[in-house]
UniProtKB/Swiss-Prot annotation:
UniProt protein name: Exotoxin type G
Keywords assigned: Signal, Toxin, Virulence
Record GO terms (molecular function): toxin activity
Keyword Signal carried by entry: yes
More about this protein: Binds to major histocompatibility complex class II beta chain.
Gene3D superfamilies in alphabetical order: 2.40.50.110, 3.10.20.120
InterPro entries given in the database record: Enterotoxin, Staph/Strept_toxin_CS, Staph_tox_OB, SuperAg_toxin_C, Superantigen_bac, Toxin_b-grasp_Staph/Strep
Protein role: Mitogenic for human peripheral blood lymphocytes.
């Protein structure tokens, strides 16, 4: 009798553990599908455009381009205090990921605004190292291309994710990757981390994923030392 009870307990534990693993696996697949959909997007990318007006938490930009016979504007939502750095009439560069496509003549983004600089068409190159379960390889220079002296973490993050999606299929539902991080290192030994799997986000939507860019974190290309990407399969 005791043997039968013990067997039942063991089988129940095994079944429960197996169910938990299956549930976690489905959650990871849902997360990957959502991230693949979110980042499979054409960014708002404009150079030398003008700020129409600013509010306490938004920057409204006139792109001088037309869509649906109307002038196309970009409305960037930012954290409090960010708009103190900009005024009406400033020339800026925009690189942001739209999370809302209504109305059709306004692209809504979070952050993604830097003062315009005449960098020309020269692509900046950064040293990158990919670490997969402890195995390191240097990344090719085309892993991320940026043509501005100043750029936002949003632009760098997006371009790294696109590279990893195209070359390593990190967000494919059946891919072996379970977690990953991007570390951007500056020459003063500071590191800025981005969770490439957004595991702290409760809602699997573009709005939720892109809201992290509200801080409009800006880097000067001359300050960058290198970047590291860590991908894990277990």
């Amino acid at each position: 009798m005791k043997t039968n009870i013990l067997t039942i307990i063991i089988l129940s534990c095994v079944f429960s553990y197996g169910s938990q693993l299956a549930y976690a696996d489905e959650n990871l697949k849902d997360l990957k599908r959502s991230l693949r959909f979110a980042y499979n997007i054409t960014p708002c990318d404009y150079e030398n455009v003008e700020i129409a007006f600013v509010t306490t938490n938004s920057i409204h930009i006139n792109t001088k381009q037309k869509r649906s016979e109307c002038i196309l504007y970009v409305d960037s939502i930012v954290s409090l205090g960010i708009t103190d750095q900009f005024i009406k009439g400033d020339k800026v560069d925009v690189f942001g990921l739209p999370y809302n496509f209504s109305p059709p003549y306004v692209d809504n983004i979070y952050g993604g605004i830097v003062k315009h600089s005449n960098q020309g068409n020269k692509s900046l190159q950064f040293v990158g190292i990919l670490n997969q379960d402890g195995k390191e390889t240097y990344l090719p220079s085309e892993a991320v291309r940026i043509k501005k002296k100043q750029f936002t973490l949003q632009e760098f993050d997006f371009k790294i994710r696109k590279f990893l999606m195209e070359k390593y299929n990190i967000y494919d539902s059946e891919s072996r990757y379970t977690s990953g991080s991007l570390f951007l290192a500056t020459k003063d030994s500071k590191h800025y981390e981005v969770d490439l799997f957004n595991k702290d986000d409760k809602l699997l939507s573009r709005d939720s994923f892109f809201k992290r860019y509200k801080d409009n974190k800006i880097f000067n290309s001359e300050e960058i030392s290198h970047f590291d990407i860590y991908l894990k399969t277990h």
